[in-house]
């Protein structure tokens, strides 16, 4: 049962995104015979809402708990706690409001219904979106006044419409009402409009959006801006938190941790979902293993709010969905510079002739999504002198060849470059140095011999690079030694690269390196002894490196090392020098390897060793 059977005071929560059915669930609980029997019909249901009269609500709760309307000030008689009572507070917006409405009285259970997670997550029920069967029943109730598709009506049309609502009760009810008593021909048109990301009619869209927009008024301005930034990404995709962090940091002047806190706040308000990759269970130091997802309706609201006003004056210039060409309204507005700081493009294959001239003097973030084997980058990049974050993502089935790359001379202010499912362009001595690039991401790319060119001084091209991430690059056989010339590096992450066999022996040149992640590199056989000469190394992840059989004998020299993740390795022992790892505080290994750390555990006070079960399944990322 949801409610406690003892007589202690208790607070529990119901949480979920706007329109998910939280209030309906709470009202059903208030009417439920078993619940009412448990509380002897002593159930109070109050709606708090956005601008509550807290004094009046508090008075109503006090009168309910005392059983009469006599005033007791702030004190309540001892007899109050002798009976069980249920107080349901619906639509609570802030923790401050909740605190003023709470009475810590034995026997009293308070059920808090809120979009945000205001109650301990361990006692909060998260309302899930509806499965197909329940979604269809709810939709049919609204569209046909019955719980099933009427005889003779197209079940295929109903299924398509229900699918577009993605299980959100609010959307299902509004959409059903807009199609009620309409002929099948109208439904067919509605399905076509929905498939294009358009509303069935203005009423359908406005009713859903109005309810969601109202909840955004509680956000502080910066958090609301970050919510609107989510519209820059394609619907239905997992967004790596690293991409979002880089974006928010640059355009909102936030530190990494503060940007992540904003995402957590949005997640707590059910305006997005944070998903942690289950393969990373150790205490890592990167956000790369976390992804963000967002319900399509929430993304549509962000786009709706963003795409108001004159095109050239918008802070964000976003394409809601993939199109063969750029929107015609963009071309009609290109007679003056665009005001956008964030630009997001989503197309198919583009040739040089498909682009038209655009001027983005204020653009700091450019996101290019496409689906093609060949892609010509937009020529107007050459004029984006303020660009800080550049994201290129190919959603096609094979890596694309990029044309008009490397990056033009005007992008020397670039801080972060994300390349996904493309052939990494070959570096050349004529390439203009990216003097301010700090972070480079190569995801599902063909690296070819891009970095392995001794005639090129990579450190000159990337003089300030601090982080390099290489993930799912199956043609990477070894990390080129030239990369070790980038002495500013403090993080190297090589993950899910099935063919890498060794690291360069001159890795000791990376005197600033703090993080070395080598997750799921099954052919990596050893670590170079030079790793023991890294004076600032804090974190090493060698988990799921199935062929790695030993650690360097002098690993104990790395006195700064704090965390090691070595799940699913083939290590048969730990070097005796490991007892000198005086800063080590956290080790993750599989259960059979616990005995290896016994001596180290005795020698290093406070060392925590976490054992996990064996598991490994190297799969390509889902689309």
UniProtKB/Swiss-Prot annotation:
Keyword Nucleotide-binding (UniProt): yes
Pfam families assigned to the protein according to its UniProt record, in alphabetical order: NB-ARC (PF00931)
Domain of life: Eukaryota
GO biological process terms held by the UniProt record: defense response
Coiled-coil ranges per UniProt: none
GO molecular function: ADP binding; ATP binding
InterPro entries xrefs: Apaf_helical (IPR042197), LRR_dom_sf (IPR032675), NB-ARC (IPR002182), P-loop_NTPase (IPR027417), WH-like_DNA-bd_sf (IPR036388)
Residues binding ATP: 16-23
Domain NB-ARC: start-end pairs: 2-51, 119-249
Record key words, sorted: ATP-binding, Leucine-rich repeat, Nucleotide-binding, Plant defense, Repeat
Intervals holding LRR repeats: 488-511, 512-534, 536-558, 560-581
Record comment regarding domains: The LRR repeats probably act as specificity determinant of pathogen recognition.
Biological role stated in the UniProt entry: Potential disease resistance protein.
Family recorded in the similarity comment: Belongs to the disease resistance NB-LRR family.
Protein name: Putative disease resistance protein At5g47280
Species for this entry: Arabidopsis thaliana (Mouse-ear cress)
